[in-house]
């Protein structure tokens, strides 16, 4: 969907379950911005990264993504937040699906921030974004993310008005 758009600049706001390295890479290739809510815990993009063990943080990450596992890649994987291996069975459109053993390892570079912030006394949200830290501090990110709720409730109201209660979004 991103690739087919003629829009020159956009900010893609999305909820959990839309997070994937492939989606983020497509948005980055288009020179768009993204702000996705991501899962906390042992699943999702944040699970494989070295993140602070604190309630709130803002961590810039520059990943080299590959779909080849070599001894050199294994060494890079030991360095926190440096390299990410994505198995070939997982979709990633910016690396070759097949290659010979003699071919050099290819990497795709992806830069983003993972930010965790408080939204109420006892709850937090974790987001992934490529918006610059200087231009978009945590307070701005909170406001941008809150705008997504307006879209969500408008979509729900439209579904009920049109009688489309069983219409669901798809990944």
Locate the predicted segments by residue.
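Single, function-defining residue in the core of a domain
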Residues: 1-171
